[in-house]
Amino acid sequence: MEGDASDPEPPDAGEDSKSENGENAPIYCICRKPDINCFMIGCDNCNEWFHGDCIRITEKMAKAIREWYCRECREKDPKLEIRYRHKKSRERDSSERDGSEPRDEGGGRKRPAPDPDLQRRAGAGTGVGAMLARGSASPHKSSPQPLVATPSQHHQQQQQQQQIKRSARMCGECEACRRTEDCGHCDFCRDMKKFGGPNKIRQKCRLRQCQLRARESYKYFPSSLSPVTPSESLPRPRRPLPTQPQPQPSQKLGRLREDEGAVASAAVKEPPEATATPEPLSDEDLPLDSELYQDFCAGAFDDHSLPWMSDTEESQFLDPALRKRAVKVKHVKRREKKSEKKKDERYKRHRQKQKHKDKWKHPERADAKDPASLPQCLGPGCVRAAQPGSKYCSDDCGMKLAANRIYEILPQRIQQWQQSPCIAEEHGKKLLERIRREQQSARTRLQEMERRFHELEAIILRAKQQAVREDEESNEGDSDDTDLQIFCVSCGHPINPRVALRHMERCYAKYESQTSFGSMYPTRIEGATRLFCDVYNPQSKTYCKRLQVLCPEHSRDPKVPADEVCGCPLVRDVFELTGDFCRLPKRQCNRHYCWEKLRRAEVDLERVRVWYKLDELFEQERNVRTAMTNRAGLLALMLHQTIQHDPLTTDLRSNAER
């Protein structure tokens, strides 16, 4: 059974006149139905047809089957087994079917009679031997001329090519397999993009082609070696160009480079019946001619067959003996284009850059070849050769030379530094003086805020000692319009102005407690009391950094007793203190809600600002001192130098800067 299982063959001519569903219609498959309007597969032993749905075989699965037998035949003869085809033969058969397979009257494909000999030849291995076998088995092609090698060598080569896949043509032991870099001079390397070629051959470097498993046409043969036999190595006259096309398809040379405009007169056209249905040819399907094969192995990829290698100066690396034995091919003269010139210039520039990179990346290559070319060590009194890629023979020589340089240069630089004043040094001193003045003012401000803090605590303590007056007017806002409403800044609800402060304070505490402000370290400030909350949160592993008096998350307002006085200091004209206190009960006073907490928060916030200012000034002072220290250090004196053109004038500043 062939790989494409198609619809069954139509019935005989006598059955065409009968109805398809009639009584005399042929029946198929294990279901014994005459239905032929679906995918079917035939047994290669009993020639019985079966529906794919009944035996659970799809059309895609049938394409991978070479011979299929039904269950009854396999039970009768256990030697019958379903055979599957390889991927290469499957693709080749599908391409042959698309071009030349006969079709029946209903549009379906007919299954040709299986030919075991042809299948055995089609399943042969790759290589020259397999190509010759397939070429002789083709009914449309004449048998090719025999090669010089003996039949035993051909059989051995066929077995070797069958065992070796295309993707594993490396023995790993020869010199070509152990080579890791491209030569950059052969035709395959010059075709690569990294060497400026068009990348159309797409083969490995010839020096990296395995000498045991690679194709003969890809191997590198120097002038001393030759892939041909001694009988063929003798010089022979070149074959003249054919004046008329000869009907021998075995003399074609594979794929020609159409885009380069090369026309090979030695390649003869195929007969009309072969070219009527074009099909993609692989390297295995191409027949070979012995003479052309020897010429191809000798020098098919020389400067005549590769148009982009037409420069004589660039093709000098090819062996002249191989060029003489190359196939004579006609070329069509191409027009000179600017793109080709640009490619040549780009290739030359790339070669120069590559040589420069190799020189710096691998300096030990040239040194290893010529030990006498190694430079002498630069160490003091050392006569040894320097290490590859270094100026010294060892680390000790480098350290000795560096120490001698310091002893010789540093005293002179220190003397120059002391003689001429440094502008940056003077600017640094002025900046330090300004920073110190700002630090002093910040400390004074901090002391003032500490004094205000203690004064506030004294005022709060004295206010709590005041007596509550019941006869004092407690409803000062009753005369206002009771219909007036304002909106809360936190929740946006309308509220009465009399209770606005109380409502807004509670709303703020509720929303503020939903967010945490923390640091990984607690605050430690000498002389500061009651500044940050600093409550440790074990979940986030942080310390709370809100003000202690305003933190709604870790502190709550104490419960106010009924007889506690408000005690808020009364003012005149907003800022002028009168010296009196509010003596209303704290529960009834709506004007001075939480006045102690707000006053304490005001003082604490100002103290925090002063501490931040001091911290910033300390950081500036540290940076300036570090710069001044490094300016006269060893590294700075060795790297930088100021040249004094007038030795009598040591001060290089202008009169305005002095």
Curated annotation (Swiss-Prot):
Cross-referenced Pfam families: CpG_bind_C, PHD, zf-CXXC
Ranges of Basic and acidic residues composition bias in the record: 90-120, 337-347, 361-370
InterPro entries: CpG-bd_C (IPR022056), Spp1/CFP1 (IPR037869), Zinc_finger_PHD-type_CS (IPR019786), Znf_CXXC (IPR002857), Znf_FYVE_PHD (IPR011011), Znf_PHD (IPR001965), Znf_PHD-finger (IPR019787), Znf_RING/FYVE/PHD (IPR013083)
Basic residues: compositionally biased ranges: 327-336, 348-360
Positions annotated as zinc finger (PHD-type): 28-76
Modification N-acetylmethionine occurs at: M1
Posttranslational modification: May be regulated by proteolysis.
Biased composition (Low complexity): 153-163
PROSITE patterns, per database record: ZF_CXXC, ZF_PHD_1, ZF_PHD_2
Keywords from the named record: Acetylation, Activator, Coiled coil, DNA-binding, Isopeptide bond, Metal-binding, Nucleus, Phosphoprotein, Transcription, Transcription regulation, Ubl conjugation, Zinc, Zinc-finger
Localization in the cell: Nucleus speckle; Nucleus
Compositionally biased intervals (Acidic residues): 1-14
Protein name: CXXC-type zinc finger protein 1
Biological source species: Bos taurus
High-level lineage: Eukaryota, Metazoa, Chordata, Craniata, Vertebrata
